[in-house]
Each structure stands twice: as structure tokens, then as C-alpha cells.
Design a protein with these regions (language model features):
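Short solvent-exposed strand/turn elements
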Residues: 132-146
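Short, acidic/charged, Gly/Pro-enriched secondary-structure junctions
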Residues: 74-116, 120
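Compositionally biased, intrinsically disordered low-complexity segments enriched
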Residues: 31, 39, 97-98, 148
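Solvent-exposed edge beta-strands and adjacent loop segments
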Residues: 2-70, 112-135
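A short, polar/proline- and glycine-enriched secondary-structure boundary/capping micro-motif
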Residues: 21-26, 75, 148-149
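Hydrophobic transmembrane signal anchors and adjacent membrane-proximal interface regions, especially
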Residues: 9, 56-58, 91-93, 142, ...
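Short, cysteine-centered beta-strand-loop-beta hairpins and adjacent loop/turn segments enriched
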Residues: 69-74, 144-147
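Residues within well-ordered beta-strands of beta-sheet-rich folds
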Residues: 63-65, 98-100, 137-139
Length: 149
């Protein structure tokens, strides 16, 4: 089993099929995906004093932070930066969009996760004489799909 280099795990917007390279979210430094399962309680009088559970709701979310930039070195507005995500999916339309998370190398057997999500929070920090950073939180809606490419 090969250990995955964290640099190869990236966040990108994708088509509604989850295939293709997607549009990489620029300047990401850290990203994580979380999948949760909340079993439902079925404890009853015959449970013998122990709680019992069955399958329940699942949810997923993605957190990302990185350097904040809204233009490239030539001064052209980024189309794959955090500002573009915020403008397109929060400020103008409050819409959900498809996102992919996973390996982006050309090596076969890369695992990618993709699904539809909403931006639930976004913040920018800008300290004096320091790199401006941004953080973004995405909450999935519906199924999170795993692809091996």
C-alpha cells in the first residue's frame, strides 16, 4: 500500500457526473473531508438496559484553507479562486454546486469523492505584513460518491 502525499489531494469544482479533471480551487493549502453517520435509537423495554441502534442519516462536509488571492500575477481576476466560488454560489444565487475531493495525479487507482454541496461559511484573515488566508466550509447535500480513476 502506497502512502498518499497530501499535496496530491486537492479540492476542485466538477461536472455533475464527477468525471473529468475539474476546476482546481486555487491556492489551497489544507483540505479535509468528513463523513458522519448518526444511527437512530431503537432502544425499547426488551433491550435489557442497553441502548440499541440501527442505521441512520449520513452527512459529509469539506473544510479548506489556503492563501487568499483574487487576481493572478498579471492582475487578471481568478476564475478558480475562492472569490469566484463565493460570487457564483453565495452572493448572486445561493446555489449548490458539485465539488470533487481527492487525488489529481495521472496515476491510475486515484480515489476521488464528489457530490453536491453548499458553501456554509467563508472567511478571510489579513494580518499586517502577513499572507492573507481564507477558510471555506462546504456541507454536502445528498450522496457522496467515490470514484477510482
Amino acid at each position: 500500500m502506497a502512502i498518499l502525499n497530501g499535496t496530491e489531494v486537492k479540492l476542485y469544482t466538477v461536472s455533475n457526473s464527477g468525471v473529468g479533471a475539474g476546476n482546481l480551487v486555487a491556492f489551497a493549502q489544507n483540505c479535509s473531508i468528513s463523513i458522519e453517520h448518526s444511527p437512530r435509537d431503537i432502544t425499547n423495554k426488551e433491550s435489557g438496559g442497553y441502548s440499541e441502534s440501527l442505521e441512520g442519516l449520513r452527512s459529509w462536509s469539506i473544510e479548506m484553507d489556503g492563501a487568499y488571492a483574487y487576481t493572478d500575477a498579471a492582475g487578471t481576476a481568478l476564475t478558480n479562486g475562492a472569490d469566484a466560488l463565493i460570487e457564483d454560489n453565495v452572493l448572486n444565487l445561493r446555489q449548490k454546486f458539485f465539488v470533487g475531493f481527492g487525488g489529481t495525479t495521472t496515476v491510475t487507482s486515484d480515489v476521488r469523492y464528489w457530490g453536491e454541496c453548499y458553501i456554509t461559511s467563508w472567511s478571510v484573515s489579513a494580518g499586517t505584513e502577513d499572507t492573507s488566508t481564507m477558510s471555506i466550509s462546504l456541507t454536502g447535500t445528498g450522496v457522496l460518491t467515490q470514484n477510482v480513476v
